[in-house]
Amino acid sequence: WRSVYREQFFYQLYFLKQGIAEQEFEQNLQRSLYLTYCNFDGRGVAANSSHRSLDLEPVKRSDASFLAGMYEPKTYPDWLTPDDLAYLVGQFENSGLRGPLNRYRAQNIDWYQLPQLSQPVEQPACFITGALDPVNAFLFRGAPTRAQIEKHYHNLVLFELLEDVGHWTQQEAPAAVNTLLLKFLESVGAK
């Protein structure tokens, strides 16, 4: 990531900086979480599309902060209520953000300790993503195709790209995700 995003902002590189992301988020945890959830769902990505490159990825200077320039919607999305957000804020007020951010900080360790990660998955697999998930932008330069995903699985049973859905797939489209999961489980003989 460091070489690809040398000249522009990339959230995973920003999260590597100990204490910086924590400080930014914890200044106003409710607003920080609200912006994060609302900017990476389908509605937020669509609202930001005029400020984003064609591959759905925000273009900011490499020294920008995470929340800089984020769209601030006036209403909650259908999948998130004020009570949901209050609960999440309370949880992070108790635990802080270091743990979740350390997941990003430990990525390089994964490659050393888990060399098998470069091998295709052998088990039957199901891949569900939102067509507007920004993660697809840096992995595939847009919405992935089945062929791009199949390279990583020996038995990709189900591939589904959910239209108008962003990063929070199961929250944004719970009925569709549940239907697809049941279809996948049925196809592999689960009862």
Predicted features by range, described:
Residues 153-191:
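Catalytic active-site module of serine/aspartate enzymes centered on a nucleophile-bearing elbow/loop
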Residues 1-157, 161:
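Flexible "cap/lid" subdomain of the alpha/beta-hydrolase fold that forms the substrate-access gate
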